[in-house]
Structures are given as C-alpha cells and as structure tokens.
Amino acid sequence: MHTFLIVLLIIDCIALITVVLLQEGKSSGLSGAISGGAEQLFGKQKQRGVDLFLNRLTIILSILFFVLMICISYLGM
C-alpha cells in the first residue's frame, strides 16, 4: 500500500509540474501595477477554455498531492 501511494504521488507530481508549465503566464505583474496597468490587474478577467481547465486541474492535482502526502505520512508512523 505504501509503495502504491508513493507511485501515485510521483505521477501526481509529474502531472502537476506539467499542468503548471502549460498555463499561460500573466504578462502584467508587479511592474504593470506600478506603471499604470491597474485596470487590468483589478478588472474582472474571466478565464475561458483551456485556461479554465488548466486552472481547475491544478487545484485538483494540488489537493490530491496534499492528501497523498498526509496518507503516506500516516502510514509511515
């Protein structure tokens, strides 16, 4: 059981890294807020399509990561 959870954790880590790297970068970061890009920073920006899917998948994989880590820690005691 412990080995199975570790294999799942490795798969989850690889998937999480891949999904994060596939996401589109936010072009107006701190420099955009300072230099007058505040309307883009504070305005409503809806995510659509692939961006929305990748964002939700990142959240799901992150939750799975923490659940697997807690289970592995619990079984290790």
UniProtKB/Swiss-Prot annotation:
Its job: Involved in protein export. Participates in an early event of protein translocation.
Enumerate the InterPro entries for this protein: SecG (IPR004692)
Q: Where in the cell is it found?
A: Cell membrane
* Superkingdom of this protein's organism: Bacteria
- GO biological process terms held by the UniProt record: intracellular protein transmembrane transport; protein secretion; protein transport by the Sec complex
Disulfide-bonded cysteine pairs: these are none
Tell me which family the UniProt entry assigns to this protein.
Belongs to the SecG family.
Question: Which GO-annotated molecular functions does the record name?
Answer: protein-transporting ATPase activity
Q: Where is the signal peptide?
A: none
Q: Which UniProt keywords apply?
A: Cell membrane, Membrane, Protein transport, Translocation, Transmembrane, Transmembrane helix, Transport
Q: How does it sit in the membrane?
A: Multi-pass membrane protein
From the Swiss-Prot or TrEMBL record, give the protein name.
Answer: Probable protein-export membrane protein SecG
Q: Which PANTHER family match?
A: PROTEIN-EXPORT MEMBRANE PROTEIN SECG
TM annotation in the entry = 2-22, 57-77
Q: Which GO terms describe its cellular component?
A: plasma membrane
